[in-house]
Amino acid sequence: MSTPLQGIKVLDFTGVQSGPSCTQMLAWFGADVIKIERPGVGDVTRHQLRDIPDIDALYFTMLNSNKRSIELNTKTAEGKEVMEKLIREADILVENFHPGAIDHMGFTWEHIQEINPRLIFGSIKGFDECSPYVNVKAYENVAQAAGGAASTTGFWDGPPLVSAAALGDSNTGMHLLIGLLAALLHREKTGRGQRVTMSMQDAVLNLCRVKLRDQQRLDKLGYLEEYPQYPNGTFGDAVPRGGNAGGGGQPGWILKCKGWETDPNAYIYFTIQEQNWENTCKAIGKPEWITDSAYSTAHARQPHIFDIFAEIEKYTVTIDKHEAVAYLTQFDIPCAPVLSMKEISLDPSLRQSGSVVEVEQPLRGKYLTVGCPMKFSAFTPDIKAAPLLGEHTAAVLQELGYSDDEIAAMKQNHAI
């Protein structure tokens, strides 16, 4: 089966989550992704949050499928020589080291261009070079705090909250992926590679654009009519936290369903659409609200929006969350059950679509991983297990022209 990136070689100098999520997707699209790891150590996530002693952690295996792994010590002369040969043959190099780390290895962008002017250099950092935080170490929640997500997440009477979704890490990887694919297309026109940089702060901010929209509206109006604070609460000079309210102008809230007293996920998310208000009233047994001037428009409803949700909840609390969604869907009401990770892991439809995939690694055995979220008509990514540390070192070196004796000597010299 032909794949979009067949014939593209990627050098993966990334670790933890932001970089590996990007290079894993490149591998799913058919690129030959070579993960370069420290001899005897490897990516730190191989050892983090283990569920089986001395076996690669799920943290690693779920972010590095379809890749090849080599152990390479770039501090040695032989290791640097191998690195230069790899760069010469590669199409893309991706790194997410601390600022300046790859330069200290001797591989500045200028030197890389000399070795291979067609190479595309992808780089993930916490902050842009012009940021005052450029030297701050960045992880997932650091990026959420600096990118505007934390200040706008949570309830108005509580502290900022970070999302459980990887807005700082995997989201940054997906943004870089888009940039790398664009750079590949640009190379087809120019014949030259380029540097593509992605800051975690920028990636989070790009998902918070509606909050920047709201900031400008707040500056002009002094209030935000779709937020729960309107019209009875107060607004400060910055976009407030809105709890579980919808952020796109359509009021929404988390509602209890049957069993909520003991099941922490017995809830649905319910959205009120202006154009679907009549159906909403019929669904919840309040047809009189259709023509009542206190309820007939979104502006009229906002002062007592929580009373409306409480009325809707009187119905949803009597039935199972799946029954609630099935019933409300008949009225074209946007809603969904709050699915636990346990439910997601067992969902047959997600298995069927390839969104959740079972793979097998030689030492770990079978495990679940998240599959490719995009569904293509011309090809289906074949999700394979993550590599063992150094599993492909000899094979990659042989492809570069090294003999068995030379490979043995490099191992003796701790270059691999």
UniProtKB/Swiss-Prot annotation:
Family indicated by similarity: Belongs to the CoA-transferase III family. Frc subfamily.
Listed NCBIfam families: oxalate_frc, PRK05398.1
Active site: 169
UniProt KW keywords: Transferase
Protein name, UniProt field: Formyl-CoA:oxalate CoA-transferase
Residues given in the record as CoA binding sites: 17-18, 38, 72-75, 96-98, 104, 137-140, 273-275
Enzyme category, top tier: transferase
Source organism per UniProt: Shigella sonnei (strain Ss046)
Function: Involved in the catabolism of oxalate and in the adapatation to low pH via the induction of the oxalate-dependent acid tolerance response (ATR). Catalyzes the transfer of the CoA moiety from formyl-CoA to oxalate.
